[in-house]
Amino acid sequence: PFTRKIHKLDGKFYINPDGLEWKRAKWPKPVQAYLKYSEKVMTRYADLVISDNPGIETYIQDTYPWSKTTYIAYGTDLSPTTLTNQDAKVRDIYKTWNTYEKNYYLILGRFVPENNYETAIREFMSSSTKRDLIIICNHESNAYFEELRSKTQFDKDPRVKFVGTVYDQDLLKYIRKEAFAYIHGHEVGGTNPGLLEAMAQTDLNLVLGVSFNRSVAQDTARYWKKDEGNLSHLIDQVDAISDYSELGKLAKENMKQNFTWEKIVGEYEELFLS
């Protein structure tokens, strides 16, 4: 009904589907079916579907060929951390975690199954690295945490450390910058803000090689598959090299060219004023 009201006012109805919500494992089958149906209906009535990832735009075009689509990316903050290794909050948090700069792989994101925590943890545990795996997420009182503990027995590997949440954005930038590598397992499209934040701060990014992630990271990351042994082998490969600063420069340049908020806002302004 509201689309008719918009059109009566000579307005346009634009939608941004974000990702493929109906694919998320947290939803029961009836809810997934409803979300998939809603996706179809919204494309019927929208004047334009704006996708934040080329993979999402391709999916919309292929699945709903009647849709008019465009691509406008998501953005990220490229400013570096103001903290140094001498700051008290930096030293305190590393002391609490019993680790230090470049001595850890990092996972940071929503604590849900479709972000492939189980695969990442299993593969890390199978690797030979002596570095830690720092996992920043809201795991307290979460049934998924106990499920993972039961399935992987990560609590028996002292390298695997669930450290809770960190809300200080400047400190998070420092933690990202000083990670030896970031492991990204998100696969339910489209452009994930956490991946952009990692590419803007972390030199080495180990990214699940689905199309949504590849279209963002391009050739500035190392990719892995969910096949058993694939990520653990990659970890062992990269672990032998200490400096990935050149790859980090390429990643930051990619973010600067394609994912700044100035660029994104400008593209939306151009669309709305056209």
Model-found features: residue ranges?
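Membrane-proximal helix-turn-helix segments that form the acceptor-binding/catalytic region
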Residues: 31-49
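Glycosyltransferase donor-sugar binding loop
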Residues: 76, 108, 132-147, 161-166
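Acidic donor-binding loop of glycosyltransferase active sites
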Residues: 174-190, 203-204
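Helix-loop-beta element that forms the nucleotide-linked donor phosphate-binding surface
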Residues: 57-78, 82-86, 100
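Conserved donor-binding/catalytic core segment of Leloir-type glycosyltransferases
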Residues: 93-115, 121-128, 134
